[in-house]
């Protein structure tokens, strides 16, 4: 799977980068929209999930993290779409995996913390790479992975309602440049395949059809 029409990051690439970032012991893998949720409620865990079925080739990557200390599930969407927009654009809903995760806990109650700002440009194909960056923050600072940590402070979020605005495109482009520098520093796999990865995930990749 990738993030649509063969663009973006493959599952193999994401797994290799996530390992380089130190997420390996907690990383459950890459999944399509049928991700079952977190079935071991006492263990810190994370995953990268596509909004589409595997049979489609993929559409958009999201990252999930489970912090057992607070029974909290983190959902990171590089676009920061609302639940309604995720359903409208990708036909993706995550209530089922939350319900299954909750049933695995003792009190059957969990908290969802979801990203609401955009860090990725609207025509960018780097969603999978942004998910890797978030998971680095999650495994190193599981109590504050969305912000307030050295990794996610590197990028600047903008209101999702401004995603298409020319005014914020320079900020979103800078985010992607920062993302590439971050991965170049922390991932040997990225360094070895940088040219190909940057070409496949370019800021304007979705215009190159």
Curated annotation (Swiss-Prot):
Its EC number is 3.4.22.39. Signal peptide: none annotated. InterPro entries: Papain-like_cys_pep_sf (IPR038765), Peptidase_C5 (IPR000855). It is an enzyme of class 3 (hydrolase). It holds the Pfam family Peptidase_C5. Requires DNA and protease cofactor for maximal activation. Inside nascent virions, becomes partially activated by binding to the viral DNA, allowing it to cleave the cofactor that binds to the protease and fully activates it. Actin, like the viral protease cofactor, seems to act as a cofactor in the cleavage of cytokeratin 18 and of actin itself. Keywords: Autocatalytic cleavage, Disulfide bond, DNA-binding, Host nucleus, Hydrolase, Late protein, Protease, Thiol protease, Virion. The record marks 57-58 as: Cleavage. GO terms for cellular component: host cell nucleus; virion component. The active site is at residues 60, 77, 127. It is found in: Virion; Host nucleus. GO terms for molecular function: cysteine-type endopeptidase activity; DNA binding. It catalyses: Cleaves proteins of the adenovirus and its host cell at two consensus sites: -Yaa-Xaa-Gly-Gly-|-Xaa- and -Yaa-Xaa-Gly-Xaa-|-Gly- (in which Yaa is Met, Ile or Leu, and Xaa is any amino acid). Interacts with protease cofactor pVI-C; this interaction is necessary for protease activation. All late proteins expressed from the major late promoter are produced by alternative splicing and alternative polyadenylation of the same gene giving rise to non-overlapping ORFs. A leader sequence is present in the N-terminus of all these mRNAs and is recognized by the viral shutoff protein to provide expression although conventional translation via ribosome scanning from the cap has been shut off in the host cell. Cleaves viral precursor proteins (pTP, pIIIa, pVI, pVII, pVIII, and pX) inside newly assembled particles giving rise to mature virions. Protease complexed to its cofactor slides along the viral DNA to specifically locate and cleave the viral precursors. Mature virions have a weakened organization compared to the unmature virions, thereby facilitating subsequent uncoating. Without maturation, the particle lacks infectivity and is unable to uncoat. Late in adenovirus infection, in the cytoplasm, may participate in the cytoskeleton destruction. Cleaves host cell cytoskeletal keratins K7 and K18. This is Protease. It comes from Human adenovirus B serotype 3.
């Amino acid at each position: 799977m990738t993030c649509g029409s063969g663009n973006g990051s493959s599952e193999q690439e994401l797994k290799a980068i996530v390992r380089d970032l130190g997420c390996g012991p907690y990383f459950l893998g890459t999944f399509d929209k049928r991700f079952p949720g977190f079935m071991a409620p006492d263990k810190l865990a994370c995953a990268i999930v596509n909004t589409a079925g595997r049979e489609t080739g993929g559409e958009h990557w999201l990252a999930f993290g489970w912090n057992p200390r607070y029974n909290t599930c983190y959902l990171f969407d590089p676009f920061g779409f609302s639940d309604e927009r995720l359903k409208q654009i990708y036909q993706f809903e995550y209530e089922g995996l939350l319900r299954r995760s909750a049933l695995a806990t003792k009190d059957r109650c969990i908290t969802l913390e979801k990203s609401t700002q955009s860090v990725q440009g609207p025509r960018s194909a780097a969603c999978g790479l942004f998910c890797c960056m978030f998971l680095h923050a999650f495994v190193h600072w599981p109590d504050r992975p969305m912000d307030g940590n050295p990794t996610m402070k590197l990028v600047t979020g903008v209101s999702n309602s401004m995603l298409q605005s020319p005014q914020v495109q320079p900020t979103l482009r800078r985010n992607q440049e920062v993302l590439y520098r971050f991965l170049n520093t922390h991932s040997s796999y990225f360094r070895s395949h940088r040219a190909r990865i940057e070409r496949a995930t370019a800021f304007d990749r979705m215009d190159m059809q």
